[in-house]
Regions:
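Amphipathic, non-transmembrane alpha-helical secondary structure
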Residues: 81-84, 102, 170, 273-281, ...
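Cofactor-cradling patches in redox/metallo enzymes
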Residues: 256-258, 266, 271-331
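Peripheral docking tails and interdomain loops at the edges
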Residues: 322-357
Length: 357
C-alpha cells in the first residue's frame, strides 16, 4: 500500500535532516530513560536485547524522518502498527513501544530543536493514537491472495508440500498462464500472506523459511524452462545488500530483467556493499537493481547509491529500486536518488524499458 504524500516543504526537509543528524543522540537518551523507567524490560532483554532495541529505535527515527520529508503520516503509522504486531507476537507481554515513541519525541525536541519537534509531533501523535487502538490499520504485508490458485499454492507451501505446490504452478503454466502472472498474482501475494502470518505469530520462523525455500526451488525450475528473450546488448546486476535476507523479490526482478533482454547477474541476499560496488566496477552494468523489503534496509541502499553516483559518473548505471520498503512511502525512491521504481518487479522493469525506448 502507498500513501499520497504532501509535497515536501523546505521546513519539512530541514526538520527531517536535523532529526537524522541527531539520531544517535536522540536514541541514546531515549534508551537510557526507557530502561530506567522499565527495569523489568532491562532484565528481560539483557545486553543483547538492549542492543537490538537501540538498533530498532534508529530505524524508527530513520523512517520518521522519511515520513516527515515526504509528508506521509499514514506510512509511519502503518510501519508502527507493523512493529507493534511483531513485538506482540514474538516478544510477549508489554513491550513499551508507545512509551519509547514518547521518549524519542522528547529526544527530538532536545537534540534536533523546536522546529524539528513541531514537524515530528503530528506523525508521532498519529502513531501513538494507532497504538491505543483508535485507528484501524493492517500489517505491512497487506496483500492477501485472491485467486483460487494463489490460495491453493499458499496452503501447499504452509504445509511444506513442495511437490503439490510445484504441480499447481506447472499445471497453470501448461494451461497458458503467463509467467508474469504467476509471479505477480500467485507467488507475490502468497508470500506476502506468509509474512503476515509470521508477523501475527500464526506461523513459526521455520515455517516461513520453508515456504520461501519451496518458492525459490519452483522459481529456479520455471526459469530453467523459459526461453530467454533476444539480448539488448545491455547488462544488469541485482542484489540484496547486507542485512537483507528477503531475496524472492530480488530474484523476481532479476528474472524480469533477463526476460526483457538484459544479461543479468543475480548476486542473492546479504551482499556486502563493498563487494557489490566492486562487481559494478568490474561488470560495468547498464542497470543495477537494489530491492528492499523492510524500512531498515533503506539506509544501506541510500549509501550504495551515493557511492554509485560519486564513483561512476561517466558510465553510471541506471538505478532501479523497489520492494515493500519503497512501497510504503511514495517518493522515497527519489529521496535515495534512484532512477526507476515500481510497485512490483514487473512494473519497475516495464518503466525501465519504457524510459529507454
Amino acid at each position: 500500500m502507498t500513501t499520497e504524500p504532501t509535497p515536501a516543504s523546505a521546513t519539512a526537509a530541514s526538520s527531517a535532516a536535523a532529526i537524522e543528524q541527531a539520531a544517535h543522540a536522540i536514541v541514546e537518551a531515549a534508551i537510557e530513560q526507557f530502561y530506567e523507567l522499565r527495569p523489568d524490560l532491562r532484565q528481560r532483554h539483557g545486553p543483547r536485547g538492549i542492543a537490538v532495541c537501540r538498533e530498532d529505535c534508529l530505524y524508527h527515527i530513520e523512517f520518521l524522518a522519511a515520513a516527515i520529508r515526504n509528508g506521509s503520516v499514514d506510512a509511519f503509522v502503518q510501519y508502527i502498527r507493523w512493529v507493534d504486531g511483531v513485538l506482540r507476537a514474538h516478544a510477549g507481554g508489554s513491550h513499551g513501544l508507545g512509551q519509547m515513541l514518547e521518549l524519542l519525541g522528547q529526544g527530538i525536541r532536545r537534540s534536533a530543536g523546536e522546529a524539528a519537534w513541531t514537524a515530528a509531533q503530528p506523525t508521532l501523535d498519529a502513531a501513538l493514537a494507532a497504538l491505543q487502538g483508535r485507528v484501524e490499520g493492517h500489517g505491512l504485508y497487506a496483500m492477501p491472495p485472491t485467486s483460487a490458485l494463489a490460495r491453493s499454492y499458499l496452503r501447499a507451501i504452509l504445509q511444506g508440500n513442495r511437490l503439490l505446490a510445484q504441480q499447481l504452478i506447472l499445471d497453470a503454466v501448461r494451461e497458458g498462464m503467463p509467467l508474469r502472472q504467476v509471479y505477480l498474482e500467485v507467488f507475490q501475494p502468497a508470500l506476502y500472506e506468509v509474512g503476515q502470518l509470521w508477523e501475527t505469530g500464526q506461523i513459526s520462523v521455520a515455517q516461513e523459511h520453508l515456504a520461501t525455500a519451496i518458492t525459490q526451488t519452483i522459481l529456479a525450475a520455471l526459469y530453467a524452462q523459459t526461453p530467454l528473450a533476444p539480448g539488448r546488448g545491455q547488462r544488469a546486476i541485482v542484489a540484496c545488500l547486507s542485512g537483507n535476507h528477503h531475496e524472492i523479490g530480488a530474484r523476481m526482478a532479476a528474472d524480469f530483467l533477463q526476460w526483457a533482454g538484459f544479461d543479468t547477474l543475480y548476486l542473492g541476499a546479504n551482499t556486502p556493499e563493498a563487494s557489490f560496488l566492486a562487481m559494478v566496477d568490474d561488470f560495468k552494468p547498464h542497470v543495477v537493481g537494489l530491492p528492499s523489503s523492510l524500512p531498515r534496509h533503506i539506509e544501506g541502499v541510500r549509501a550504495v547509491i551515493e557511492q554509485i553516483h560519486a564513483n561512476f559518473r561517466r558510465d553510471r548505471p541506471t538505478i532501479l529500486v523497489g520492494g515493500l520498503a519503497f512501497n510504503l512511502v511514495d517518493g522515497l525512491w527519489r529521496q535515495v536518488n534512484a532512477d526507476v521504481w515500481g510497485h512490483n518487479a514487473g512494473e519497475a522493469v516495464d518503466r525501465l524499458v519504457g524510459a529507454a525506448a
